[in-house]
A protein has these predicted regions:
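Polybasic/polar functional segments that serve as interface/processing modules
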Residues: 1-141
Length: 141
């Protein structure tokens, strides 16, 4: 567990603070996730504008343990369409959440690779991908 995991969960209002580093992004996700306790696997996604702040709406979709092509394809296709209507410099932020404890799993790394590969295919600019379990929020990769 990292030093920042021992710190209190950041208040929710800090989720809209600028993201200027990977650690900032991790802290924004910590604020958005709140107390860590997950019953199902979800993929969370939000947009970070050119001002480097999260948009006010974060979405999530249920996912299976292993990535499925159509789900990843549809997400990236939708994000590309959305980004086409937004200011240049807007990026997508992704977080996988699910029950459990311990270090990053092979399956989580597979999810990260699938998401990254499909994002490249659709030219969706991604922030570093994170994962949250019942113990901590961690950078994937």
């Amino acid at each position: 567990m990292s030093h920042s995991e021992l710190l209190p969960i950041p208040p929710l209002h800090t989720a809209c603070d600028p993201v200027n580093s990977i650690e900032d992004l991790r802290e924004r996700w910590r604020a958005l996730m709140g107390p860590l306790s997950f019953g199902t696997r979800l993929l969370w996604f939000g947009l970070i504008g050119p001002d480097r702040c999260f948009a006010l709406k974060i979405s999530r979709v249920p996912i299976r343990p292993r990535p499925r092509g159509p789900i990843v394809w549809n997400l990236m296709s939708s994000l590309r369409t959305l980004l086409d209507d937004l200011e240049p410099g807007t990026t997508a932020a992704l977080l996988l959440s699910g029950p459990g404890r311990g270090s990053i799993s092979t399956i989580e790394l597979l999810w990260s690779k699938s998401l990254t590969d499909m994002a490249a295919r659709f030219a969706v600019p991604l922030e570093p991908i994170f994962r949250a379990n019942d113990e901590l929020v961690a950078l994937l990769g």
